[in-house]
Amino acid sequence: MELNEYQKRAMDTCMLSCDNFSYMALNLVAEVGEFVGKVAKQIRKENIEIGDNRLWYRFTETDAAYACDGELMSEAGDIFWQLAGLCAVMGWDLEDIAQLNLKKLASRQERGLIDGNGDNR
């Protein structure tokens, strides 16, 4: 599926009351918080640990690991929906944003500036 197709189809599910910058921006942050909250709860329960910059499942049952992974994927989808919505209310196509980001990253990589801080590097 193309990103712009996803954006259009996702926004077909958007209620009129949600089609505004404030809702999309604030709820994007909320959805990221829900994702991180689910990870934190599983860390507290010792079902997940973070090591080598990735999540490691420590469930004793495979079904529980798949269920947790499914919940996190669902939250990632909610984050993606909110990002698509934020771009839509700004009048931006997701594909354009993705291309701009890849161009910026390629430029930084060519100049040896991938690692660092600040927008203008």
Question: How should each PLM-predicted stretch be described?
Answer:
Residues 1-76, 80-121:
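Flexible "arm" and connector segments at domain edges
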